[in-house]
Curated annotation (Swiss-Prot):
It comes from the Bacteria. This is Small ribosomal subunit protein bS6. It holds the Pfam family Ribosomal_S6. Binds together with bS18 to 16S ribosomal RNA. One of its GO terms (cellular component) is cytoplasm. GO terms for biological process: translation. Belongs to the bacterial ribosomal protein bS6 family. Keywords: Ribonucleoprotein, Ribosomal protein, RNA-binding, rRNA-binding. The keyword ATP-binding does not apply. CDD domains: bS6.
């Protein structure tokens, strides 16, 4: 298993239920072949530049350990979700 770090930015106008649903989906995918180490909610922050006409975003950092194929599945799920405006997964 490898250590990964995921940061994703959710639309600032999305409600708490949407944010929780996104995080629960990430947790569900990681649980298939890995474990969540830490979840850190940074809250709403100003973006360095506008993304999809938004100047702010709600940031979430997730550290997890998993097999190599899990980040690909998380990436696929976050690309599909219209409330996620940007995400990045790196090997920690």
């Amino acid at each position: 298993m490898r250590n990964y770090e995921l940061v994703y930015v959710v639309k600032p106008n999305s409600d708490e239920e949407v944010r929780e649903a996104i995080l629960n989906k990430v947790k569900e995918v990681v649980a298939t072949d890995g474990e969540i180490v830490k979840v850190d909610t940074w809250g709403t922050k100003k973006l360095a530049y506008p993304i999809a006409k938004f100047t702010e975003g709600f940031y979430v950092l997730v550290n997890f350990k998993s097999a190599v194929d899990v980040p690909k599945e998380i990436d696929r799920n976050l690309k599909i979700n219209e409330n996620v405006i940007r995400h990045m997964i790196v090997v920690a």
